[in-house]
């Protein structure tokens, strides 16, 4: 934020304004990269994800203790912060502010694709609301891996992710799924 003092006038003010406009034009909004990570074998990571993790300013990780193994394996030194189920709303606000100030951020989960039964939804929603650009770098997703090796129909499927721990809710969902004709994927 810039404040011009009232004592600057005429040509001096015009020059300063011109410089400020150029600075503002040169300021870039950061970007969110949703980076899929390996679901078992570290070598399943894509080159694009590796390059992105090395180039961004910050990595937001579901569990930094878990993700450090991946980063160390590939000699990635990018700073990391936590972004998980229990801090997602407040942390998403913070991360969006960082991106609005030009910081590029990669979001990774412990395994698989952010937002698919892992943290990511809230941050993506807030990025859209704030006009922060984002992109998804495809890679492993456990549900698709399971589907492809199941031998079941793959053209149409239903992904329900994790069933609730509440017994009544779980029973209700299972009763609903009995009528489902598509292949069902559950975690």
Residue ranges and their predicted role:
Residues 18-25, 29-30, 145-187:
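Beta-strand/loop-alpha-helix module characteristic of Rossmann-like adenine-cofactor folds
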Residues 18-86:
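Glycine-rich, flexible N-terminal cofactor/catalytic loop recognition
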Residues 30-34, 102-106, 183-185:
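Residue-level preference for the first positions of well-ordered beta-strands
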Residues 53-59, 131-134, 183-184:
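Short active-site oxyanion
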Residues 77-85, 134-135, 155-161:
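Short hydrophobic/aromatic-enriched beta-strand-loop microsegments
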Residues 87-95:
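Glycine-rich, highly charged phosphate/nucleotide-binding loops
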Residues 101-158:
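Short glycine-cluster motifs
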């Amino acid at each position: 934020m810039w404040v011009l003092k009232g004592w600057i006038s005429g040509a001096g003010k015009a020059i300063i304004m011109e410089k400020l406009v150029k600075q503002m034009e040169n300021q870039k909004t950061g970007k969110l990269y949703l980076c899929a990570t390996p679901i078992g074998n570290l070598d399943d990571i894509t080159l694009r994800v590796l390059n992105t993790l090395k180039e961004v300013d910050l990595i937001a990780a579901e569990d930094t203790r878990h993700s450090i193994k991946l980063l160390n394996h590939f000699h990635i030194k990018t700073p990391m912060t936590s972004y998980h189920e229990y801090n997602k709303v407040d942390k998403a606000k913070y991360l969006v502010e960082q991106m609005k100030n030009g910081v590029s951020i990669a979001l990774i989960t412990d395994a698989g694709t952010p937002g698919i039964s892992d943290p990511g939804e809230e941050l993506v929603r807030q990025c859209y609301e704030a006009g922060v650009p984002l992109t998804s770098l495809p890679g492993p997703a456990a549900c698709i891996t399971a589907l492809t090796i199941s031998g079941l129909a793959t053209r149409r499927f239903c992904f329900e992710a994790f069933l609730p721990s509440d017994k009544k809710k779980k029973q209700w969902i299972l009763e609903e799924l009995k009528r489902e004709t598509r292949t069902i994927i559950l975690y």
